[in-house]
Amino acid sequence: MSDDLNPGPEHLETEADFENRWNALLAEMETRFGKRPDLNALLLLIGVQELGQGVASFTKEQKQDLMHIATCKLFSLSGHYELERVDEDGWPHYKLLRPVPFAFLKEQERMLKWHMLEYFTTDFD
């Protein structure tokens, strides 16, 4: 993982601890929703939460937009994005502050997982 996305010494944890936290989150989501979510389902859930308009039917394009909102929200936790405005329909728009560093697929997945753990810990504790 890139240095500017590492959580810092106060958050150092073993890979096993990280995986345990991740699996605990998935288990909690499975308990709440009756199905174990994948990364895309969690991104969609976060996007719906950030939109704040409750459960609704969304088009395929809206679902992609919700996942983009989620990604921006997650990476705002590490200073890469900030909420710029909410449009007249209530959809949030984020401004890129600094690029998210290049990462291969496995690193990207780990970055998303780490940010999701932070999101659910910060926003739901």
How would you name each of these model-derived features?
Residues T31-L39, A56-L66:
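Structural motif
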Residues A41-G54, L66-L77, W114:
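Short, hydrophobic/amphipathic alpha-helical patches that form generic packing surfaces
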Residues R98-D125:
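Helix-rich interaction surfaces within compact, conserved domain-sized segments
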Residues F58-Q108:
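Amphipathic protein-protein interaction modules
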Residues S2-L51:
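N-terminal low-complexity, intrinsically disordered segments
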Residues R36, E50-Q53, K73-V86, Y119, ...:
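Amphipathic alpha-helical interaction segments
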